[in-house]
Amino acid sequence: MLDILIYPVSGVMKLWHLLLHNVAGLDDSLAWFFSLFGLVITIRAIIAPFTWQMYKSGRTAAHIRPHRAALREEYKGKYDEASIRELQKRQNDLNKEYGINPLAGCVPGLIQIPIVLGLYWALLRMARPEGGLENPVFQSIGFLTPEEVESFLAGRVSNVPLPAYVSMPTEQLKYLSTTQAEVLSFVLPLFITAAILTAINMAMSMYRSFQTNDYASGFSNGMLKFMIVMSILAPIFPLSLGLTGPFPTAIALYWVSNNLWTLLQTIIMMVILERKYPLTDDFKVHHLEQRDIYRAKQKEKRIFLWTRRKNRALMILTPWNASTLHATNVELTKTRTAEINEAKQARKEIANKRRETQREMNRAAMQRLKQRRAEVKAKKKGLIDASPNEDTPSENEETKLSSPQVEPTTTAEPNREPSQED
């Protein structure tokens, strides 16, 4: 599977190497060195429009959130077919008005992750040729020929081979005419820089999330907490993996340059975003209201947990009151559990009612579709069996009958409103 990912990476690196070595006249080692930066420029330039679209879609989704909340509040408690259809229509109109594209945020990751995997796999195969570095048998890797693989293997930066890594066995380092100390002295600042840049990028991403976080969504709140944890752990990965894992020098260079590009691109795009699409007053008011509600719930939860823990501590300090304190904790837990279950049950009932209404709408739509298909077949059969003396329909009528305007939304998207012909 990873072999497929090698081809685009090796193809881009080969083109940059040919351009820098054959056209610009750079030394072979320098050409391979700068081809890594060329790979970053190429990939980031390709995904830059999608990244901007992701930023823009995120800001648009924030602007539309107060209007969606108002619609949900307006149709709260309405489960009949007419209300659901009207709500769906108004939501679709709102999405069209603001140009919402929920898939825009997926593209950068879908492009960048395979590139990183392909680069890592390609460099690892270069650093570990068949037969070992002592008796290498060079083979084609993606679009790279055996001669180009051998040339890359001989590439050096500050006298450190591009395929070398800190945890590489001593025999292989000796074959590459280097030592672990030389490799460590070169890559350690790179991995530290990569860790710092990663931390800054995560902090900026968290800042954007705090700006527009949907506090009414449990998933959004969970993702925000996950990002907080990852912002602490993410900077550790470059150091730990770089110093203990098989991460060649070339990947360290790619890592630093890619994170630096990400930082500069994020700063530029955030400045443009704030100037062209500033947060609206409606969103700010709605965001503050939702945040206050969320914080009140969190405070209530903390008070509950703190009271229960305090009672447990008092049970140890004052054992003569243990039974009373335990009964208090049991009662507190029962009350809170009952409140949570009641709220869950209410949400579940609402969801079930809407789901049942939606099923009825889907069944009715499918029935109408079958009926229309049967009518069209009957009309076509009547035309074929018609007598030659009978008036035949015009050419336009035949075309219309042979290509009936069946509602496409009924099969693919049965949730939408049926056409006026029904």
Swiss-Prot record:
CDD domains from the entry?
5TM_YidC_Alb3
Region (Disordered) residue ranges read 350-422
Where does it reside? Answer: Cell membrane
Listed Basic and acidic residues bias regions: 350-362
- Report the principal subcellular site: membrane
Q: Which Pfam families match?
A: 60KD_IMP (PF02096)
Question: Transmembrane residues, as ranges?
Answer: 30-50, 103-123, 183-203, 226-246, 253-273
Going by the UniProt record, its keywords in alphabetical order are:
Cell membrane, Chaperone, Membrane, Protein transport, Transmembrane, Transmembrane helix, Transport
For this record, the Gene Ontology CC terms, alphabetical, are: plasma membrane
**Polar residues composition bias: residue spans:** 401-413
| Membrane topology designation | Multi-pass membrane protein
Among InterPro entries, the record links this protein to:
YidC/ALB3/OXA1/COX18, YidC/Oxa/ALB_C, YidC_ALB_C
Q: Which GO terms describe its molecular function?
A: membrane insertase activity
GO biological process terms, semicolon-separated: protein insertion into membrane; protein transport
For this chain, the family text in UniProt reads: Belongs to the OXA1/ALB3/YidC family. Type 1 subfamily.
Subunit description: Interacts with the Sec translocase complex via SecD. Specifically interacts with transmembrane segments of nascent integral membrane proteins during membrane integration.
Summarize the protein's role: Required for the insertion and/or proper folding and/or complex formation of integral membrane proteins into the membrane. Involved in integration of membrane proteins that insert both dependently and independently of the Sec translocase complex, as well as at least some lipoproteins. Aids folding of multispanning membrane proteins.
Full protein name: Membrane protein insertase YidC
The organism's taxonomy opens as: Bacteria, Bacillati, Actinomycetota, Actinomycetes, Mycobacteriales
Q: Which gene carries the instructions for this protein?
A: yidC
